[in-house]
Amino acid sequence: MNPLIQSLTEGQLRTDIPSFRPGDTVRVHAKVVEGTRERIQIFEGVVISRKGQGISEMYTVRKISSGIGVERTFPIHTPRVDKIEVVRYGKVRRAKLYYLRALQGKAARIKEIRK
């Protein structure tokens, strides 16, 4: 990578990101702008993928809201996310959990790792 680009992106990287992987349940505190006001909206769900590296790294969180699956993709180092909390650590054997989209109810559960 170009040293100039690398030095610019290093200043943008966040250091307060917890360690989480696909299968973990996270609570994302996202900043939402409505008109002139800004508020925090909490989005809690299972991380189904994590891709990219460095400043362009992204993760996708899936939750079931009123019986409908909702997925949101966030950049890891965005200032639009106030904080990320890991609620539960899950044990999975895949890096991408897209198969959870087809499952519902108890079949979509993920085994928990006790820490």
Swiss-Prot record:
Instruction: State the Gene Ontology BP annotations.
Output: translation
UniProt cross-references to InterPro entries, sorted A to Z: Ribosomal_bL19, Ribosomal_bL19_CS, Ribosomal_bL19_sf, Translation_prot_SH3-like_sf
Q: Which UniProt keywords apply?
A: Ribonucleoprotein, Ribosomal protein
Gene name, Swiss-Prot/TrEMBL:
rplS
Q: Name one GO cellular component term.
A: cytosolic large ribosomal subunit
Ribonucleoprotein as a keyword of this entry, yes or no, is yes
Could you say which protein family the record assigns here?
Answer: Belongs to the bacterial ribosomal protein bL19 family.
| A Pfam family annotated for this UniProt entry | Ribosomal_L19
| Signal sequence, renumbered to the chain | none
Ribonucleoprotein as a keyword of this entry, yes or no, is yes
Record-linked Gene3D superfamilies: 2.30.30.790
**What is the protein name given in its UniProt record?**
Large ribosomal subunit protein bL19
Task: Provide the species name.
Answer: Streptococcus thermophilus (strain ATCC BAA-250 / LMG 18311)
Function of the molecule: This protein is located at the 30S-50S ribosomal subunit interface and may play a role in the structure and function of the aminoacyl-tRNA binding site.
Give any GO molecular function from the UniProt entry: structural constituent of ribosome
